[in-house]
Swiss-Prot record:
Source organism (scientific name): Mus musculus
Binding partners and assembly: Homodimer.
Domain TGS: 64-126
Annotated protein name in UniProt: Threonine--tRNA ligase, mitochondrial
Function, as annotated: Catalyzes the attachment of threonine to tRNA(Thr) in a two-step reaction: threonine is first activated by ATP to form Thr-AMP and then transferred to the acceptor end of tRNA(Thr). Also edits incorrectly charged tRNA(Thr) via its editing domain.
Class of enzymatic activity (EC top level): ligase
Subcellular location: Mitochondrion matrix
């Protein structure tokens, strides 16, 4: 009984409510936990005992009748500091009580076992909701952290939920890493914690108490000093583990029906000192085993569509250790990349955007002015100019040729576009100014998070910024939304929108935020697509519309965005002369449809499984001669296709039969095969087949080329069916 053994080794009696038979693990997999684990747990128990007494006193002193408003207008009675959301859920339905993972009280996430304090609006969250999944996977990350502490003596750093599961970063020492063989052991300990149904216990602690609890964890001490601005912060205890966390969490670990650890990698912790290498273990969990099995089946199907696999098989791109975090696009991959960019460029021209080019390297003074240096410095690549290492360049000529400032590669285009807007006087007559930029961006993602095209150090975006007058804002937002719908429709993606409103600590006047949020809401309502409200999830500089597209496998991806920005125009003192001749400040809209072109290309590759639509395809047509006598005509056909701007290859491998070459073309996912024999040569025709083995018969060569061009230019998704 591995978990029981660990408790007894620390000298603590096994709590009566947790005495249970657990899965047996070998003695070798149950090393003695570090001394600080017992010390921290002992202090937590002391604080918890005091907390329970305080709560009992509050229940007696402040108990009063309160009204709880439920969805659909229903109201129920409760007692302040006594009634919990879980108790109310149980009154409504046993099924609801069993499936709820957390509550939402007045728009804020709330533990199910935390007593309600006053009249409020209450909503229950299940695993089916995005918020419910986030809570569920966050709690699962805590279980993983507890296992890592007990098994590996890990010093925990962070354990968040993600869009597709969870991970935990922890420190094992400078030389120690997590081996793949240790994942099954960690997973088994997680299963023990789950089987024990350990409760998640929420406790508020003072800053001094927090420092005592985490005196052996320099990561948590750093977070306490940096993030804890009030007199107290919350910690959660789960079994032997205690962690600094805002919560909320599940009621107990037994609500996790199935958990699987997936990968181990490295990550970086950046503070004021030198970066430290952390170990990252990721996983997935579900309320029921059946959901895990379904996920595994979908994952297996997704692995067959992995864009890295498709990129290798179709010779689209590759990566090299000599340029980490950057992609090498081969000719075929460049064809897809350029087709995507050309699509967006065509829409830019149609919608009144002006494409610009801006520098890649800037003085950090720019980023200080924009505020990015303060908030984003850890994710930027910076360098010293040549000749500044101890060398006096004061007499070396023009300052522009010998800058002394630290330089940084741009991680986004918005400050450069602000400089471009401000470089000459502007009039209200030229608004809106819509600037688009495909310039290369660099962001210093942790090396452990790099993976294929989804996370890169170097990438490009279909980045654009709109400078407009306040009265133009709604029309511009509607234009951005229409842009999204147009592009995603052509690419075959469905999408969902969410309006994120002002967060705590927002900058600017509340009145401006109210007006902007109202404008965004009106634009969304007129747009006619479903959307959700995410209160408090906006950026500190303005509200935003988050866009989640769904691929052919139903997986969500956040690529596009529409964000309002009140702060950057003020920071750069942007002005235009209004109708009355007085200077006025423009509103700035950040917008992207594809987001990272590289990432979107990867999403597309997986969504279509390598069967690219004709207009994007790097494998449009392969010409196959029946015999060597038709090889010369086959080359003429290929040249005719290439002259028209179509991608074509020739398969004249005489060592393979015709049927083998046709099959090879199908497996390679060529959209069309033009087979030419003696009859086709004499008639100047081609015998057309599709990649799905539909035989369209003999067609005139010139007409076939013209038809392909029509289908390509129209960007139809099913050219093989409508040829």
């Amino acid at each position: 009984m591995g978990l029981c053994l660990r408790w007894r080794r620390l000298g603590f009696p096994l709590p009566e409510f947790r005495r249970c038979e657990l899965h047996t693990v070998r003695e070798a997999s149950a090393p003695t936990p570090p001394h600080w684990l017992a010390e921290r747990f002992g202090l937590f128990e002391e604080l918890w005992t005091a907390h329970v007494k305080k709560l009992a006193s509050m229940t007696q002193k402040k108990a009063r009748a309160i009204k709880i408003s439920l969805p659909e207008g229903q109201k129920v009675d409760a007692v302040a500091w006594n009634t919990t959301p879980y108790q109310l859920a149980h009154q409504i339905s046993v099924t609801l009580a069993d499936t709820a993972v957390a509550a939402e009280v007045n728009g804020e996430l709330y533990d199910l076992d935390r007593p309600l304090e006053t009249d409020c609006h209450l909503r229950f969250l299940t695993f089916d909701s995005p918020e419910g999944k986030a809570v569920f996977w966050h709690s699962s990350a805590h279980v993983l952290g507890a296992a890592a502490e007990q098994q590996l003596g890990a010093v925990l750093c962070r354990g968040p939920s993600t869009e597709s599961g969870f991970y935990h970063d922890f420190f094992l020492g400078k030389e120690r890493t997590v081996r793949s063989a240790e994942l099954p052991i960690l997973e088994r300990i997680c299963q023990e914690l789950i089987a024990a149904a350990q409760p998640f216990r929420r406790l508020e602690a003072s800053r001094d108490q927090l420092r005592q609890l985490f005196k052996d964890n320099h990561f948590k001490l750093h977070l306490i000093e940096e993030k804890v601005t009030g007199p107290t912060a919350t910690v959660y205890g789960c079994g032997m583990s205690v962690d600094l966390c805002r919560g909320p969490h599940l009621r107990h670990t037994g609500q996790i029906g199935a958990l699987k650890l997936l990968t181990n990698s490295s990550a970086l912790w950046r503070s004021l000192g030198a970066p430290e290498t952390l170990q990252r273990v990721s996983g997935i969990s579900f309320p029921k085993v059946e959901l895990l099995r379904n996920w595994e089946a979908r994952r297996e199907a997704a692995e067959l569509r992995d864009h890295r696999r498709i990129g290798k098989e179709q010779e689209l791109f590759f990566f090299h250790e000599l340029s980490p975090g950057s992609c090498f696009f081969l000719p075929r991959g460049t064809r897809v990349y350029n087709a995507l960019v050309a699509f967006i460029r065509a829409e830019y021209a149609r919608r009144g955007f002006s494409e610009v080019k801006t520098p890649t390297l800037f003085s950090t003074k720019l980023w200080e002015q924009s505020g990015h240096w303060e908030h984003y410095r850890a994710d930027m690549f910076s360098l010293k100019p040549p000749g500044t290492d101890g060398v006096d360049n004061s007499q070396s000529g023009h300052p522009a040729r010998c800058p002394k400032d630290t330089l940084a590669l741009k991680p986004m285009n918005c400050p450069a576009h602000c400089l471009m807007f401000a470089h000459r006087p502007r009039s209200w007559r030229e608004l809106p100014v819509r600037l688009a930029d495909f310039g290369a961006l660099h962001r210093a993602e942790a090396s452990g998070s790099l993976g294929g095209l989804t996370r890169l150090w170097r990438f490009q975006q279909d980045d654009a910024h709109i400078f407009c007058a306040p009265h133009q804002l709604e029309a511009e937002i509607q234009g951005c939304l229409d842009f999204l719908r147009c592009v995603y429709s052509v690419l075959g993606f469905s999408f969902h929108l969410a309006l994120s409103t002002r967060p705590p600590g927002f900058l600017g006047e509340p009145r401006l935020w109210d007006q902007a949020e109202q404008v965004l809401q009106q634009a969304l309502e007129k747009f006619g697509e479903p959307w959700d409200l995410n209160p408090g999830d906006g950026a500190f500089y303005g509200p935003k519309i988050d866009v989640h597209l769904h691929d052919a496998l139903g997986r969500p991806h956040q690529c596009g965005t529409i964000q309002l920005d009140f702060q950057l125009p003020l920071r750069f003192d942007l002005q235009y002369k209004g109708p009355a001749g007085t200077p006025e400040c423009p509103v700035l809209i950040h917008r992207a449809v594809l987001g990272s072109v590289e990432r979107l290309l990867g999403v597309l590759a997986e969504s279509c499984g390598g069967k690219w639509p004709l207009w994007l395809s790097p494998l449009q047509v392969v010409v196959i001669p029946v015999r060597t006598e038709q090889e010369e005509y086959a080359r003429q056909v290929q040249q005719c296709l290439q002259a028209a701007g179509l991608v074509s290859d020739l398969d004249a491998d005489s060592g393979l039969t015709l049927s083998r070459r046709v099959r090879r073309a199908q497996l390679a996912h060529y959209n069309f095969q033009f087979v030419v024999g003696q009859r086709e040569q004499s008639q100047r025709t081609v015998n057309v087949r599709t990649r799905d083995n539909r035989q369209l018969g003999e067609r005139d060569l010139a007409e076939s080329v013209q038809r392909l061009l029509e289908l390509q230019n129209a960007r139809v998704p099913n050219a093989e069916e409508v040829f």
